[in-house]
Amino acid sequence: MADTLAGKTLFITGASRGIGLSIALRAARDGANVAIAAKTAEPNPKLPGTIFSAAEEIERAGGKALPLAVDVRDEAQVRAALETTAATFGGLDIVVNNASAISLTTSQATDMKRFDLMHGVNARGTFMVSKFAVPYLEKSANAHILMLSPPLDLQEKWFAPNTAYAMAKYGMSLVVLGLAGELRRKRIAVNALWPRTTIATAAIRNLLGGDAVMRASRTPDILADAAHMIFLKDAGSFTGNFLIDDTFLSENGVADFDRYRVDPTVDLAPDFFVPDDSKPPASLKKLSG
């Protein structure tokens, strides 16, 4: 397989900031085309980045960018965005379902509007983007769909503190399980990628404790590097995998994980939904908790 994404076209949801933008920038450094499918067209004082600022960064990194204002809950917007992407760049090779809504609340503290948002974005949005991307991906020589979602480790401890969010996030992983089997004969790979530790994004800062958790996190670059490696795999054989970022990178020759740490002096904070039997690479320093 090729060792570059040069000339490939990616459609990434939630790519105006954070993990989605990091994946986009890693592809852009290869010379890829990137459609930025996100809601943020106007600046938000609480969340940095818009589809237009992301497009500027992608272009500076060496890629070609297409900013698209898209709500992944809206069928017409999703269909139109995929059609525009394929028409602009002459096809579609990779879809990244990164957009996600989160509310770390108990059942009694979760209002139904928030419940519907999480399921509409996470499970339904992921299914819909993937579904409508298939006719374009079928024409690619090495098509990939990637979900930023956890391994299917259905334990009470993951659900009890925030049932609605866990349901919605695992819903994305169920899409992986189903579509990997359905699309295997079409040679469209469908995989999931999940971080072992918290990742330094605005969402983590706002939801999990501000600067202290940020210092105990890794940068989004670890997921960007892992995603890049996934996209270079043969789609006909590398599918149906639920991957933890550092384990996958270690298995593919990466040994230095300190470069991803925000603060190397602080113990790393573990993320949600990492299975108990998922062992970190031997070179990984201590996690807290």
Task: Tell where the protein language model's regions lie, with residue ranges.
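Conserved Rossmann-fold SDR core element
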Residues: A27, G91-D93, S173-V176, L183-P195, ...
